[in-house]
Amino acid sequence: MTNHTIYVFAYVAQFGYNTSRHKDVANPHTRVEGSASILALIELNHLTKTFKGKTQTVDALKDINLQIEQGDIFGIIGMSGAGKSTLVRCINFLERPTSGSVVIDGKDLASLTPKELRQLRQQVSMIFQHFNLLSQRDVRGNIAFAMEIAGMKRPQIEKRIDELLEIVGLTDRQHNYPSQLSGGQQQRVSIARAL
């Protein structure tokens, strides 16, 4: 397998690109400038993920160090096979790292019970390349889905959906189904659901 590089771009809360925070996470000796571990909401320390096959071993992630502070918005880009999905899956422990640690809001995920891990995952949202919208639900229904599973009361859900539709600019498409939306609109539904 070719060794590809993953790049993580940090955006400040005002959505302006901050070039001083561009980081090549494949290089373990670089650190994001201006970060302090005390402020980090998400911290990856020497994160490694190795997959062992019958004939070869693949290092999908190798010694990644990264800190994400409150208000940061990150995007992960890289070539196919670079390890982007593996990185995201390790951040929320859908995939257990081979070594290293993932700390979210001061909690080392490896030390959490399954129940504590499920509770923490409710606070961490990620938007994947494929939006996985439910085709039998309209925009409102797709946004409501996670809140319904979390046990929120219907009036709270409806109020939050209205707020989210306004944020992502889909108020006029709230009763459309995924097949009636453009790719960009589907992504905005996914963003609303993550929020």
Predicted regions and their residues:
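ABC family nucleotide-binding domain
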Residues: 39-195
